[in-house]
Amino acid sequence: MPDQIPVRDTIFALSSGSLPSGIAVIRISGADTRAVLERMAGGLSEARFAKLTSIYSAEREVLDRALCLFFPAPASFTGEDCAELHLHGGRAVVAAVLNELAAFPGLRMAEAGEFTKRAFLNGKMNLTEAEALSDLIAAETEAQRRFALVNSSDMRKRLYDGWRRRLIHARAMIEAELDFADESDVPGSAGATVWEDIRRLRQEIVEHASSYRKAEIIRDGFQIVILGAPNAGKSSLLNALARRDVAIVTEEPGTTRDILEVSLDIDGTKVVLADTAGIREAAGRVEALGIERSLRRANEADLVLLLEDVTNPSTPEVPQGKPVITIGNKADLITDTPAASYNCLISAKTGLGLDRLMELISQASAGYSNFAGEILPFRERHVALLGQAADALEAGIDGENIGLELRAECLRLSSLALGRISGEIDVEDLLDAIFSTFCIGK
């Protein structure tokens, strides 16, 4: 991307949290920032130093006493002249200042993610760094925080840049063979020196792309489904683990028909727990649809909690190949050891055995938090572009009969796909979709 792209509008937005609050931060960015400060804040403050000042309306009415910071271009978040107004966080105060800014000629309210979009367009960050910033803001667990910070570092850029340099070197070797095939000091065959490295590179890209599921679990959560017969106590277990009433609990079989979800933070890892419809021969079409959804969700889960009522055992089938924790519920109602073998005996009603169950869940999900320090593709678009890069390399490797010119073109297409991941190559059509996921003011 170019070092700096001129943008005509000056934008502003509330960048801090919901109101009322102790402090509210309004961010301004664009060419008119200096004019705004001169009129509304009594002049420019020293760059990057906080200045206590009155904030004025156009009629010179004092709207608030605030801290003002000025960040001149290009040494700012967006690469443009920027300012921050740290106001008292009352709704009326913030509304008055925002209304005054909206009336200022040349200013408009920022769109979602527009400050970060300008930072990208002005070369202050690449596209994966912007996506990582969005993840950092949304992080709910320690693993998500660590993963977002790793993705916002330059380690990913170094990895992809290294791959692109290898492709550039390979293309240079091929071009040399094409242009100087008759010269004695040029290697006799590009295939002997180039294509073996290209095979290794393709394998590295494929293995990297295949690690996306690890990133997906860190970002979106380790997916757990509670599966069992009607009245096994699935909804009661969901409520007990969530420590709040999420699901309706009744003695009537088939109460749960839609899938209910709750997110938990277990030892720094996000875990998404889903309560599903009881598995049985359905009494009606609506319940049958719920059971169908339950089985489909179990097939997509990372872990199945197979729950059984020890006083009335009935075990549904579990999708093959899925990790399963077998749980005997209502253990408070029996005195003898149940005939069936369970990984854990609990009572969702009294809390008996829940600590042991949480230990088992933690053991099943713990390994994924260790991946938070790795460089992994963390968006579906990354995986798609990595796939395009690998496919182009495969076409070049297998294209011994198509000529070196076309094989070199395959390497160029692979390099372009890698460049699109970080936004170095033609990604204008993606920008609105990516930055619209940010909050206003970021």
Curated annotation (Swiss-Prot):
Its cofactor is K(+). One of its GO terms (biological process) is tRNA wobble uridine modification. Pfam families: MMR_HSR1, MnmE_helical, TrmE_N. One of its GO terms (cellular component) is cytoplasm. InterPro entries: G_TrmE, GTP-bd, GTP-bd_TrmE_N, GTPase_MnmE, MnmE_dom2, MnmE_helical, P-loop_NTPase, Small_GTP-bd. Binds 1 potassium ion per subunit. Mg(2+) binds at residues 235, 256. Its EC number is 3.6.-.-. PROSITE patterns: G_TRME. It is an enzyme of class 3 (hydrolase). CDD domains: trmE, TrmE_N. (6S)-5-formyl-5,6,7,8-tetrahydrofolate binds at residues 27, 84, 124, 442. Residues 221-366 form the TrmE-type G domain. It is found in: Cytoplasm. Belongs to the TRAFAC class TrmE-Era-EngA-EngB-Septin-like GTPase superfamily. TrmE GTPase family. Exhibits a very high intrinsic GTPase hydrolysis rate. Involved in the addition of a carboxymethylaminomethyl (cmnm) group at the wobble position (U34) of certain tRNAs, forming tRNA-cmnm(5)s(2)U34. Homodimer. Heterotetramer of two MnmE and two MnmG subunits. PANTHER family: TRNA MODIFICATION GTPASE GTPBP3 (PTHR42714), TRNA MODIFICATION GTPASE GTPBP3, MITOCHONDRIAL (PTHR42714:SF2). HAMAP family: GTPase_MnmE. This is tRNA modification GTPase MnmE.
